[in-house]
């Protein structure tokens, strides 16, 4: 039997500050496998529509606020995220606000009539505020940001773009 070292080792070459140089070299050479060993988590506060864009990234782990079990009636109000594409003081914005107010009123009515949060949530719009924690490795975060902040496969959803660009700025 013969045993050999299968990979190149360079622990003896590691110095203070060499990690950043090494990561940049790995990225430049498109050797992304090494980036899969580092991960971090981000908490997004966004609307349910944007959360559907986020959870499409399958190489990640998620924890999202549940509309099935959260009883918004107990907290006193339902929170909505204002769309970035509606201008203030326009008929569109006024209609959006009215629609959210009607949804909240209907939700609270259904709860007061004994419906469960799971049943009452059916009247809540995509603009409903939610919280999502996403954990991914560095390679997946690069992919996420290339799609959601940089539009590498087409124009991103306007509110997803706002969330992703904000994250990208924070990471730089």
Report the location of each language-model feature:
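Family-specific signature for flavin-dependent thymidylate synthase
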Residues: 1-172
